[in-house]
UniProtKB/Swiss-Prot annotation:
Record-stated family: Belongs to the class-I aminoacyl-tRNA synthetase family.
Lineage: Bacteria, Pseudomonadati, Pseudomonadota, Gammaproteobacteria, Enterobacterales
Protein name: Arginine--tRNA ligase
SUPFAM superfamilies per UniProt: Anticodon-binding domain of a subclass of class I aminoacyl-tRNA synthetases, Arginyl-tRNA synthetase (ArgRS), N-terminal 'additional' domain, Nucleotidylyl transferase
InterPro entries: aa-tRNA-synth_I_CS, Arg-tRNA-ligase, Arg-tRNA-synth_N, Arg-tRNA-synth_N_sf, ArgRS_core, DALR_anticod-bd, Rossmann-like_a/b/a_fold, tRNAsynth_Ia_anticodon-bd
């Protein structure tokens, strides 16, 4: 259940009854402090101004129409006109029971949409590096959340699988007589790419052959298409290993590379010309956009076809948006691409809207993100100043976690230690990123991310095992527990219950804004509240069976919420640590 939505509806009805316009916003928010109740309605200020009355006067009138019987134990006006709402313990108890009775913890399903999520997008013939981490894991957390809510999610891995470099790579592959390219490892392919580029730059005859191969590849020649396909296959096979290690849900079936849109490009250029949106300018085809200005203050020209007939990324992105609406029938499209691409995307989408390829009713959303920085505040690099390979980063995470786990559990069997180290190490890397607001840069710090205190994966994983340990110590009659009532009489019980029941609200924010850090903050808060509850409200040594069972049920909902919440982030939980 979404309590915030329920209260918003009730307060809105009371505001309208008190004379507010039908489209008034009650602005019901989770209260920042316990003394302000569980929720606070802050909408009186804006509405009172429109009505020409004092906010507190409006709040008083709203209260005469506000019926929260069975939901709130107390409703009071604070300050200039805030309405503080304190939830009824019996209501909390009933909602906890309902959440426990449902596999979905009582989370309702919104109207089902088809949502395309564009994320990860590595390049062919290159190994994934740390620059791919944020898009891959933030996008995957959004996908998991949207799918849990019941949406039809289409993962779109916009792989860089096309371009002039493929002539060079195929020519080098041929020169090396490596017809059995499938046996090449991607680490070899990294060097292979560098060698091909070196020859391309230094050997004019080789470069000429490479340019001819591009033409043959683009014209659909079977032999060259097959060679190109080998390069794509090698790359994606290696990338899949990384995706699996990261516990990311992408598969080969989700690849929708740049090459997919090639057949659409000539038709799009012709159509934009026919619609009067694109014009010839100095031999190129250009769309001038009033919405963007150049340095002189004139409409910015966006090239969609070069003088030599070649197309640009913008042309591909126009085709891509069109395809996602017309062919995939998207109701909403999310792009997890770094912030440096923002203007480029905005220009492509402006053309898309002007051409009528995607209606305004279908949101195209750039969920941009900042950079991963080293401790020096500069882009994260190797000691030698090179790009950090993602596989190397994950290897180091595993090694550090292995040492950490072995130190705390010297007698743990090797296979168990490896499994736990993997969950902790990979979880730490992912959670350190996901727990930061995606729009900002963040400092990558091994010591912080592997710490067992603070908002980290090891702390959250430990918090989960700590709740489970209560059940291991208790001799529980499952049937008796299932039918036992929840009784909320202590403040710490009420605070924990109220926060647990805000799981759906948290999921809704993550789904709407694409901000997994909101879920991380919520789960960290739940873990902290459980810790206080556990300390001050004895569970196994409670004064009687009724209180014991009730508190066990609160612990049960805590464990389920932590597990499900971490699962939406792609963070593995463990039974023991």
């Amino acid at each position: 259940m979404n309590i915030q939505a329920l209260l918003s509806e009730k307060v809105s009805q009371a505001m309208i009854a008190a004379g507010a316009p039908a489209d008034c916003e009650p602005q019901v928010r989770q209260s920042a402090k316990v003394q302000f109740g569980d929720y606070q309605a802050n909408g009186m200020m804006a509405v009172a101004k429109k009505l020409g009355m004092a906010p507190r006067q409006l709040a008083e009138q709203v209260l005469t129409h506000l019926d929260l019987s069975g939901i709130a134990s107390k409703v009071e006006i604070a300050g200039p006109g805030f309405i503080n709402i304190f939830l009824e313990p019996a209501f909390l108890a009933e909602q906890v029971q309902q959440a426990l009775a449902s596999d979905r913890l009582g989370v309702s399903q919104p109207t089902r949409q088809t949502i395309v999520v564009d994320y990860s997008a590595p390049n062919v013939a290159k190994e994934m590096h740390v620059g791919h981490l944020r898009s891959t894991i933030i996008g995957d957390a959004a996908v998991r959340t949207l799918e849990f809510l019941g949406h039809h999610v289409i993962r779109a891995n916009h792989v860089g699988d096309w371009g002039t470099q493929f002539g060079m790579l195929i020519a080098w592959l041929e020169k090396q007589q490596q017809e059995n390219a499938g046996d090449m490892a991607l680490a070899d392919l990294e060097g292979f790419y560098r060698d091909a580029k070196k020859h391309y730059d230094e050997d004019e005859a080789f470069a000429e052959r490479a340019r001819n191969y591009v033409v043959k590849l683009q014209s659909g020649d079977t032999y060259f298409r097959e060679m190109w396909r080998k390069l794509v296959d090698i790359t994606m096979t290696q990338n899949q290993i990384t995706y699996d290690r990261l516990n990311v849900t992408l598969t080969r079936d989700d690849v929708m590379g740049e090459s997919l849109y090639n057949p659409m490009l000539p038709g799009i250029v012709a159509d934009l010309k026919a619609k009067g949106l694109a014009v010839e300018s100095e031999g190129a085809t250009v769309v001038f956009l009033d919405e963007f200005k150049n340095k002189e203050g004139d409409p910015m020209g966006v090239i969609i076809q070069k003088k030599d007939g070649g197309y640009l990324y913008t042309t591909t992105d126009i085709a891509c948006a069109k395809y996602r609406y017309e062919t995939l029938h998207a109701d909403r499209v999310l792009y997890y691409i770094d912030s440096r691409q923002h203007q480029h995307l905005m220009q492509a989408w402006t053309i898309v809207r002007k051409a009528g390829y995607v209606p305004d009713s279908v949101p195209l959303e750039h969920h941009m993100f900042g950079m991963m920085l080293g401790k020096d505040g500069k882009p994260f690099k190797t000691r030698a100043g090179g790009t950090v390979k993602l596989a190397d980063l994950l290897d180091e995470a595993l090694e550090r976690a292995r040492r950490l786990v072995a130190e705390k559990n010297p007698d743990m069997p090797a296979d168990e230690l490896e499994k736990l180290a993997n969950a902790v190490g990979i979880g730490a890397v992912k959670y350190a990123d996901l727990s930061k607001n995606r729009t900002t840069d963040y400092i990558f710090d091994w010591d912080n991310m592997l710490a067992f205190e603070g908002n980290t994966a090891p702390y959250m994983q430990y918090a989960y095992t700590r709740v489970l340990s209560v059940f291991r110590k208790a001799n529980i009659d499952e049937q008796a527990l299932a039918s036992a009532p929840v009784i909320i009489s202590e403040d710490r019980e009420a605070q924990l219950a109220a926060r647990l029941l805000q799981f759906e609200e948290t999921l809704t924010v993550v789904a709407r804004e694409g901000t997994p850090h909101v879920m991380c903050a919520y789960l960290y808060d739940v873990a902290g509240l459980f810790s206080g509850f556990y300390e001050h409200c004895p569970i196994l040594s409670a004064e009687n069976d009724a209180v014991r069972n009730s508190r066990l049920k609160l612990a049960q909902l805590t464990a389920k919420t932590l597990k499900l919440g971490l699962d939406t982030l792609g963070i593995e939980t463990v039974e023991r640590m």
